[in-house]
Amino acid sequence: MTDNKNQVKDEVLAYEMLESRGPKGAPKGDPVLSVRDLRVSFATEAGRVDAVRGVNFDLWGGRTLGIVGESGSGKSVTALSLIGLLDDNAHVEGSVKLKGEELLGKTDEEMSKLRGSRISMVFQDPLSALTPMFSIGDQLAEALLIHNPKMSKEDVHKRCVELLTLVGITDPEDRLDAYPHEFSGGMRQRVVIAIAIANNPEIIIADEPTTALDVTIQAQILDVLKVAQKETGAAVVIITHDLGVVAGIADDIMVMYAGAAVERASVDSLFANPAQPYTMGLLGAVPQPHVAAEHRLVPIKGNPPSLAAIPSGCPFSPRCPMAQEKCHRIEPKLEPFAAEEGHLVSCHRLAEIRDKHMTYQDVYPELEPLPAKWADVPRDQRPIVLEVKDLVKTFPIQSKGLIRRNKGTMTAVDHVSFKIHEGETMALVGESGSGKSTTLTQIMELMKPEGGSITVLGKNIADIGNNRERRELRKNLQVIFQDPMSSLDPRMPIYDVLAEPLKAQHWDDAKINKRIGELMYLVGINPDYVDRFPSQFSGGQRQRIAIARALATNPKILLLDEPIASLDVSIQAGIINLLEDLQAELKISYLFVAHDLAVIRHISDTVAVMHLGKIVEYGETEDVYTYPKDPYTQALLSAIPIPDPQIERTRKRLVYQDGKLVPAESLLPTKL
């Protein structure tokens, strides 16, 4: 224990020597926030959970620190510990100083005075931060008055209008009387940012502030966050899993794994010279939205360790391709990779990585080319497996009040047409409300549509005469959802989950047993695990099992509704590779709905862009991404965050407004 404490002390002293010069580009003077040897553990029934283990960093006013890592790496716990919002069973050690004032050890009452005034938080889900029973104006006023009780009513109202204007809410005077449910998700997040900056805080902590938003709304929220920072001069800590977001907004980056920082650098240094094998793996797993896909993605094998049972030595060693015997025994310390830039890395093989100028291509297995998709048979000469013609779907618009009356109709899908050939992947993209999920639902239901036609494997579903025919067709058209638990019964072992669709097709036990073994092998899950329950698998493994269930009846078409949206980037890469392998082997066709446009470019052959229920652009994926013709498509593609800070700084983002393209910077709110 004494040796461990001495090692921690040495690390803190070494870190302070490096950080005393500040990261590259940091302003002179003392940091606003100084964190030393931060440790957070939780007492649970499963034992002690070490969620944060010896984190150190400094942050200056006007600068942004991005904290990245997989789920369970300790990012959010680190953020919550800074603002004193951890659960009662948390034990916190170390030091967190706000302009020299120690925050750890303060009472709840003392921290309440700081929260919202000197340090603020923006959460992932704005509804968790907004009270549905109170108007937006009331909630803004509360944020002001709780720290400024002597503010006059007129000053409060004026400041509320200023704040809504600053975050880009139109008609702020009228919007003060609105309630959270009357705002869209993006507008609610703007309001949360307005509340966070109401009292000009010195630090803003944003925990996954754009995760649930469309790419265009995400870009707008990040712009608002930048304006808020400029207005207040605050230091910003942003927690995210999206390396493209970090590249565009952060000055410095800290990569966390198993509760500890494994790499810390300026954004330029880390993206140009990632030196920790884990960081390299994260960057290798990310699809590049600005270039054509030439190689398979590089997933990181395995899963992050349980924080209740962190392995000895380097926690990443069980997954690291470079791990040696020493890596499994001794946890490495943070050491300088490029000291003049404050680039710190924890890896026993750092000297070798630095001297040989190693990249992720050297560390991870050689990149394989994408699997061939039957180049001998042109796609347009293969059979059409799914054809949609002039599809229409409307919904009634009802009046408010006790007696609901139809006031008209809203067209969710407006004469949509497309076709998918055997072995082809087609993507439907667009913002929320564009009609893509409704289109998918209409195909899924296998019922006669309100307007137009849907033809599956040459059969017009309007001509299906009975349930037997529909059941026969359904086995060839299966669905994979975003949340695998929606298709996996938590009370059933995996064997029963996979056997259920086969029993519905009246397979005998011998054939079922053989097929389940084949399915587990296909999706890369050990067949010995068939007696386990869904809760005993990781998120990525559960999605593989959901894919296996969808493949059980040998379908010709898979409908994929955001199948990787809830997964870490390293796990996403494995699922994408799996889908590509299955398509090459089985000649299966995919209709892929997703909001991640980088993934779409990597996996799809054709893409249809939807806006307000209509397809506004449709064609070969590379043609659409390289030479977009429709203004809406151009705006959509310009909003994709690219995991390269050099490119992100020089890009010009466009906004589609009133039927035309407008430079995003012209719409940014400015200092009042």
Regions found by a protein language model. Give the residues of each.
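ABC ATPase NBD coupling module
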Residues: 89, 103-120, 146, 269-274, ...
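Helix-to-loop junction immediately C-terminal to a conserved catalytic motif
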Residues: 83-84, 444
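Conserved ABC ATPase "signature" region
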Residues: 155-174, 283, 460, 510-528, ...
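Charged, flexible cofactor/metal-binding loops and thiol motifs
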Residues: 18-21, 26-31, 45, 267-384, ...
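Conserved ABC transporter NBD signature motif
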Residues: 91-102, 452-463
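P-loop NTP-binding/switch modules centered on Walker-like glycine-rich loops
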Residues: 70, 84-85, 205-209, 213-295, ...
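Conserved signature/switch motifs of ABC ATPase nucleotide-binding domains
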Residues: 116, 181, 199, 475, ...
